[in-house]
Structure formats: C-alpha cells, structure tokens
C-alpha cells in the first residue's frame, strides 16, 4: 500500500512537470517570434492626409494589413514625423526577391509600409492640387534604418544597393545622420537615413526591395516601439571632450575621469547641478546623480522649458523674374525648402504696392521661446539663395514688416538698426507704408544673411518674448575688471563701450547718411524700446591659454557655438600683454546666454 501511494505521488509530480514544461515551450515559442520593424518618415504637411479624418485612413490600413502602426508626434525643429510599422513573424521566408509581386508581401508590416507610402503620395498630390502647384513626376521616400541593417542593405562593395538601383531604376542613397538637417532630428544615434527617389513605380519597387532586405536581416539595435523612447531626441550639442563625463555617466561611452570639474572648483554659480534623471534617454542608469551643467546646454522644449508657442508670419518680396527658381519644377524647390526649414511657405502671386514686378512669399512658423533653432530664420535664409542670382556678388532682400512691430528692428533713436548695420556691414533701408513697412537689405551675401538673421530674430523675440519680464529686466552692471574665472564664481563680462555712445554717433534720426523724408522712418515714430532685450551685446574675456580650445580645429568649435546658440560671435585681436582675447556676443538674451555658457564650458575644460 505504501509503495502504491509513492508511485501515484511520483506520477502526479511527473504530470505537473510535463504541464509546466509545455507552458515553457509554448512561451519560448512566442518569444522566438521575430519582430519586423519599419520606420518611414512623413513630411508634416502631408501627415494629416495619411492619418485621415478621425484616423480613418490609418485605421483602414491597420485593419486591412493586421500590422501595428504608430504615428509619433512631431519633434521641435523637425520637418518630418516618424511612422513606425511592425509585426511578429513566426517563420521568415528563406528566399526573397528584389521585385514586388502583386499581392505577395513578405509580411503584414511590409504590406502596411507600402500602403502608408501610397497614402503619403496621395496626400502630397492632393496638397499640390489645392495650392495650384505643378505636379512633380518624381517622388521621394525616406526610411530610418539602423547601422546593422544598413550594412546588409549596402552589401559587400555596394553589391546589394547597386542591384536595387539597376533593377528598379530608382535612386537609393544611405545617408548618415546629420544633426544640422531638420529632417534628421527624429533619427536615433544608431540610425542612417535611406533616401529613395525617382518615378513613382520605381520608388515603390525600390521600397519593396529595401524592406525585403530589412525583413530578412534582424537589427542588432534595440528599436523602441513606445512613444516615450521615440520622443527623446539625440543630443545635438557638441561639448568639449574634457567635460563629457560631467554630462554623461560612465556607462562605457566616456570612461575617462574628469579632474577639472570637481566640487570646490571655480565654477560659476549659475551652473545649476542636475541629476541624470532629468535627461532620461541619454543614460542607461540614473541611480547615482552626477553634476550636469544645465546652463551649458541650450534649453529645449520638453526638458522643463516653456511650452508656450506662437505663430510667426514673415512676408518676403521676390522679383517675378526669379519666382520660378523659388518654386522649382513641379514645386520641387519650394517643397524642399518647406521640408528643410519646417515652415509653411506660400507664394502669393498677386501684385504688391511696391511694384508690378514683385510678388509676396509668406513664411509661417509655429515656434516656442525655447526652440534651439528658428524655423523662420532657416526658411528666410533658404529663400535668399533662390531669390537672388547664384553668381551675384551683391544681393538684395526685401521684407514687409507690420508698422506695429517695426520698432523692435529700429530701436530707440535708430540704435538697433544702426548697430545691425555696423556689425554686418549691410545696407539697410526702411521705407514707411500704410500697413506694412518695407525693409530692404543689400550688400555682400554674407553681410545680407547676417543682417537677415538679426532682423528676423528681433521680430521673433518681439512675438515670443515675455514683455512683462523683458520690460523690467535690468542690464548687467558695467565693470572695468574683466578677469575670467580668476578664483571668483562670477563671469567677468562688461557692456561694450559702443552702447553708451551709440545715439550720439548715429545722427539725429538714427540713420546716418540716410535722409529722413516722408517715406523713410526716423526717430519720431512711436516705437517702444522697452519690448527689446535690455542688453543687445555682451563681452567675454577669453584667456590666452583657452583660445585654441574655444576656436577648435579650423574654427570648428566656434562655428558650432554660433550654430547652436544662434548668436553672432566676434573674436577681437589681443589687447592685453597676456594675449587674452575679447569675444563679443550679440543677439537676443537667450542666444547670448546660451553662447556665453558654451564658451565658458570650453574655457573651463582647459
């Protein structure tokens, strides 16, 4: 009897073990299902047609293909939105072709990818019809592809990508991520951008071939499928390598110990220490907080910055003889400018009061005070390249500015406009009108572009700036001691001397040699200088030993500081026996603060 009970107990244990083993096998089989992920970029001006009213279009694609599709929100400064398409595949096909067979997608995710591309093309053509833009026969498609899949796509000695080009007759390029390209902002650090262009059918065939290779090759990178990971942009700020440990934790990327930025060092007091948890997505762990200098990095929306945004509208005049260069064949040029800048650009072919030989280009951009780059500035600069002749040494740009806000460009007694003239060497003339005033900027290309940046940024500051706080903000006190970080926690900077003598040297009307007639604005208009930042320029002393670090190889570091901050930076010749230099910063308060902090970060790394 005892043996029978033991035998029954053993049988019962074996049956339970078998059941658990079956569950584990079933669970492992589910986990072994391979994930196929595609990420296609959709221009922001056509994404509405891809989603459809109440999600009708995108939901229909989900229903018909059974694939998972997520449309992520637009990142600030990005001209594209990411559409992620994925599905699970139990057994992948061993043999795949490079040409699309009708109704034979390799998986439901690839089927959905092709249908999403069709929706993008249809929405783009619908927009062109509404705006009366000539139809462009060539189409373009962009995919985000990780490094591991990109290498397989290219193949040995470019064999695979050459075969795709030859069979589909489409242009297929694998482009590395460019932080200066607005369409690459949404790409991860490990991403390349695959650009496919050509005739519609050729692009679709090439898209099938590229996605077929991605179907066969599993990525080694961990591609996030949730919006929280996707919405964290990659760091686009270039900081000195000596400071990298203070910004990033030691997780294998930066292993060197930083002996400069220890507690007790002469660090300016406004460098607020933060923990890595404030930068989620940049680090693997954030258990141990490390000092992160917040003010050395530009504040971007989403990391505690202001969420308030306003719509900016700029009117640019273009001669009728050059308007086709701006639009391009089938609207290709203006479409490219829209995508590169992220702005909405419309051409109004109605004649202006300035003359019958000009038309108005309207640039509209929704921006926040915390945006790192201005979409409006990018659009105006890109338009300048096409409005003027390519080989012209001297160019001219004309803006229509509302009479209500022109004061922020002129300044009190013309102080601001004269300073822009002085700093950029551009000829700037403002003619008065009933509603809009004509701002004409002429001179060398570099001078005109610098002047346009200053004018557009001041108009932007007038719209986005906090008028209450700006009006009550006081300029920093002037000091004759310019010692920089010499045992003190305060940065040594002074107000430049030209600010005090600006009004007396600019003439009565503030326009120098420009006459103040009925059609030219003088100093008598009701312009409020209180809406401008209190300080329009700032001087920083750069020690001689830190000059090479601030400049960088070939001036690369200084150029990055200019690009990131948006401020104008001029380095004057050495005026002291120690070989120190003066950096003159000009721009809005936020731009100067950002540039100042970046310069100081490089100085501290020496």
UniProtKB/Swiss-Prot annotation:
Organism superkingdom: Eukaryota
Keywords per UniProt: Nucleus, Repeat, RNA-binding
Organism (species): Arabidopsis thaliana
GO MF: RNA binding
Pfam family, one: KH_1
InterPro entries in the cross-refs: KH_dom, KH_dom_type_1, KH_dom_type_1_sf
Keyword Transmembrane helix: no
Compartments in which it is found: Nucleus
Domain KH: 35-99, 138-210, 311-380, 394-455, 535-599
UniProt-recorded name of the protein: KH domain-containing protein At4g18375
Basic residues compositional bias, start-end: 1-10
GO cellular component, one term: nucleus
Region (Disordered): 1-26
């Amino acid at each position: 009897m005892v043996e029978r009970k033991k035998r029954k107990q053993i049988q019962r244990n074996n049956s339970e073990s078998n059941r658990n083993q079956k569950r584990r096998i079933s669970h492992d089989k589910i986990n072994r299902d391979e994930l196929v992920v595609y990420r296609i970029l959709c221009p922001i001006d056509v994404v509405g047609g891809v989603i459809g009213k109440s999600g009708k279009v995108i939901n229909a694609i989900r229903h018909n293909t059974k694939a998972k599709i997520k449309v992520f929100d637009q990142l600030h400064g990005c001209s594209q939105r990411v559409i992620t398409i994925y599905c699970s595949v139990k057994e992948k096909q061993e043999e795949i072709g490079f040409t699309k067979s009708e109704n034979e997608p390799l998986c439901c995710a690839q089927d959905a990818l092709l249908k999403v591309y069709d929706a993008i093309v249809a929405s783009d053509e619908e927009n062109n019809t509404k705006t009366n833009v000539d139809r462009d026969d060539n189409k373009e498609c962009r995919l985000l592809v990780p490094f591991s899949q990109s290498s397989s796509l290219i193949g040995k000695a470019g064999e695979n990508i050459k075969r795709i080009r030859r069979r589909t007759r489409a242009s297929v390029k694998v482009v590395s991520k460019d932080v200066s390209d607005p369409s690459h902002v949404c790409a991860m650090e490990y991403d390349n951008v695959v650009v496919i262009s050509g005739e519609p059918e050729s692009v679709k065939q090439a898209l099938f071939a590229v996605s077929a290779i991605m179907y066969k090759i599993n990525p080694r990178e961990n591609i996030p499928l949730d919006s929280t990971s996707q919405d964290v942009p990659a760091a686009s700020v270039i900081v000195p390598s000596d400071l990298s440990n203070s910004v990033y934790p030691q997780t294998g990327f930066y292993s060197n110990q930083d002996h400069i930025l220890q507690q007790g060092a002469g660090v300016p007091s406004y460098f607020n220490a933060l923990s890595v948890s404030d930068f989620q997505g940049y680090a693997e762990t954030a258990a141990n907080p490390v000092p992160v200098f917040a003010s050395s990095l530009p504040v971007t929306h989403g990391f505690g910055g202001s969420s308030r945004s306003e719509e900016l509208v700029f009117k640019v005049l273009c001669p009728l003889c050059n308007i086709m260069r701006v639009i391009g064949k089938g609207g290709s040029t203006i479409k490219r400018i829209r995508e590169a800048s992220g702005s909405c650009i419309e051409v109004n072919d109605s004649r202006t009061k300035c003359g019958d030989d000009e038309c108005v280009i309207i640039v509209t951009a929704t921006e926040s005070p915390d945006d790192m780059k201005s979409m409006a500035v990018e659009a105006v600069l890109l338009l300048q390249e096409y409005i003027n002749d390519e080989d012209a040494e001297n160019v001219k740009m004309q803006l229509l500015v509302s009479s209500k806000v022109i004061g922020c460009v002129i300044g009190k007694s013309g102080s601001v406009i004269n300073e822009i003239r002085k700093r950029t060497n551009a000829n700037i003339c403002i003619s008065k009108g009933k509603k809009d005033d004509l701002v004409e900027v002429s001179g060398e290309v570099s001078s005109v572009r610098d002047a346009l940046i200053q004018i557009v940024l001041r108009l932007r500051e007038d719209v986005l700036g906090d008028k209450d706080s700006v009006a009550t903000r006081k300029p920093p006190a002037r000091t004759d001691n310019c010692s920089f970080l010499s045992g003190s926690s305060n940065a040594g900077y002074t107000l430049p001397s030209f600010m005090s003598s600006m009004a007396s040297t600019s003439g009565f009307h503030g326009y120098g040699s420009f006459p103040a007639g009925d059609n030219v604005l003088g100093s008598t208009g009701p312009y409020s200088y209180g809406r401008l930042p209190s300080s329009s320029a700032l001087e920083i002393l750069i020690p001689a030993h830190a000059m090479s670090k601030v400049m960088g190889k070939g001036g690369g570091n200084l150029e990055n500081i200019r690009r990131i901050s948006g401020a104008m930076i001029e380095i004057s010749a050495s005026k002291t026996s120690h070989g120190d230099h003066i950096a003159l910063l000009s721009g809005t308060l936020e731009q100067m603060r950002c540039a100042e902090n970046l310069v100081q970060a490089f100085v501290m790394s020496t």
